[in-house]
Amino acid sequence: MSLFKIRMPETVAEGTRLALRAFSLVVAVDEHGGIGDGRSIPWNVPEDMKFFRDLTTKLRGKNVKPSPAKRNAVVMGRKTWDSIPPKFRPLPGRLNVVLSSTLTTQHLLDGLPDEEKRNLHADSIVAVNGGLEQALRLLASPNYTPSIETVYCIGGGSVYAEALRPPCVHLLQAIYRTTIRASESSCSVFFRVPESGTEAAAGIEWQRETISEELTSANGNETKYYFEKLIPRNREEEQYLSLVDRIIREGNVKHDRTGVGTLSIFGAQMRFSLRNNRLPLLTTKRVFWRGVCEELLWFLRGETYAKKLSDKGVHIWDDNGSRAFLDSRGLTEYEEMDLGPVYGFQWRHFGAAYTHHDANYDGQGVDQIKAIVETLKTNPDDRRMLFTAWNPSALPRMALPPCHLLAQFYVSNGELSCMLYQRSCDMGLGVPFNIASYALLTILIAKATGLRPGELVHTLGDAHVYSNHVEPCNEQLKRVPRAFPYLVFRREREFLEDYEEGDMEVIDYAPYPPISMKMAV
C-alpha cells in the first residue's frame, strides 16, 4: 500500500542528472609528441588505421554489431572532419560529432557526395557549436546515453588540448596512444600527457595499463611503431587491492563455520566518492551489477523470499535458501528460499514478529528507512540517522545473520554520505558487491530527500580472504584498476520501492574479465 511507501520528491531527477559524458582519447604521435602540421598526418601506418577503426567501432558485447540503437561516438574538430576523404565520411558504424562554430548538421550532410549517402547517414552526423565540453554535455543527455556505449575524442590539436584540461580531463578514462618512429619530424602540432604533480596534470596521475612490443609496419618503409594504453590512477580501487594484498601477506589464519578457513585482519576502512554520478563498481574484476541492483531493491521492499531473486536470474541466495541449509539452521518450518527476518525485513519492520515470507507486515515494527528519509528532510544535521539489520532476538530465525549490519547517514553542503559497518567481510566475493550495493542505497536515499550523493565510507570488522580465494585474488592484484563507471536513471518512480533494475543503467563500465571464486557456504 502507498501509505507505507516512501514518496519521491518532484525534484527526484535533479540530483543525479549526468552533466558531462566520460570519454577516451585516441592519438598517434611521433617520438616527440608530434601529431601533424594541422593539415595532414605525416606518416602512413595502415596497422594504426586498422587499430583506430577497430577500437572506435567495436562494442563490448560479444558479437554485437553497431547500430543506431547502440554504437560508439567519435568527437572531432572541423579540420579533422575535413581531413577525412569525402568518400569515407562519415566514419561508418559510429556517431560522428563534429565541432564547428559555423557549420550545422545539415551543412555537414550536404557535403556528402550524393543524396543516397545523405539519407543513409542522416542519423550518423551531429554538429556541435562549441568545444569538447559542449559535445560531452550533449552526449550526456538522455537522447544519447542509452545509444552511445563509448565516446572517443579523435582530434585535432585544439580538441586534444581541451581534453587534457578541466573539466574534460576529469572525465577522461583512457588514452590510446600509438607512437610512430618517424624518420624525421615535420610536425607543428603536438600532444603530450602532462607530468604528474604539475599544474597542467590537474591532479591526475596517468599510469600505463598496457604497452605492445615494437612492431614493424608493412607500409613498404618498415616504419617502427608501438601501442600503449594510459589510464588515470584509481586510488579508490587501490584501497581495496592494497587491503586484499595486506590480508594475504599479513593476515591471521582463522577457522570459520564454512570449514574453508581464512586469512583475516580486524579493522579497516575505505572511502569512495559518489559525486557526479560516479559509481564505485570495481574494475579489476567484473562485478555482477544486475545482481547488486536487484538485491538492493529487494532489501528496500522488505522482501525475504529469495525465489523472487532467482526467478530474475540472480542466484546469490540460492545456497543459503536451500532446503538442506535451512534445515541445518533448524528452520524446518520455512518454505524453501524463505530466508526469515533478514536484511530487508529489519530495515522496514524492525521488531515485528516474523512468520513467513508472504505475510502482510504493513505498519508492523519500525520502518528504519522511512524514518531516516523523514529525518533527512526535516533535520539533516541529526546524529541519529542510522539503521541496523542486527536484531539479536531475531538472529536464530534468520537463514544467515547479517554481515553488513549498520549504516549511518551524514549531510554536508547538500551532499548525503553514508558510513557502512560490516562485521564479516569476504574480500574476494562479498565486499565488491557490498561497496556497489551501499553506493546505490546512498544514491537512492539522496534522490528521495532532494540531496546529492556525497561519499561512501566502508568500515570493515573481520576482513578476510578465504583460503580458496588466495590464488584468484593474487591474479586480480596484477591488474591496474581502471576508471569507475557512472550511473544514470532512465526512468523515475513515484515511490522509492517501485524502482526496478531497468530504470537505471551503468555506463562507461569497462572492467577486466571475471575471475572465478567459489562461494563458501
Curated annotation (Swiss-Prot):
Keyword ATP-binding: no
PROSITE patterns, alphabetized: DHFR_1, DHFR_2, THYMIDYLATE_SYNTHASE
InterPro entries named in the record: DHFR-like_dom_sf, DHFR-TS, DHFR_CS, DHFR_dom, Thymidate_synth/dCMP_Mease, Thymidate_synth/dCMP_Mease_dom, Thymidate_synth/dCMP_Mease_sf, Thymidylate_synthase
Limits of the DHFR domain: 22-232
Binding residues annotated for substrate, in chain numbering: V26, D48, I154, Y160, T178
Catalytic residues identified in the record: C403
Cystine pairs: none
Gene Ontology annotations of biological process type: dTMP biosynthetic process; methylation; one-carbon metabolic process; tetrahydrofolate biosynthetic process
Function of the molecule: Bifunctional enzyme. Involved in de novo dTMP biosynthesis. Key enzyme in folate metabolism. Catalyzes an essential reaction for de novo glycine and purine synthesis, DNA precursor synthesis, and for the conversion of dUMP to dTMP.
Similarity comment: In the N-terminal section; belongs to the dihydrofolate reductase family.
Quaternary structure (record): Homodimer.
Protein name: Bifunctional dihydrofolate reductase-thymidylate synthase
Organism of derivation: Trypanosoma cruzi
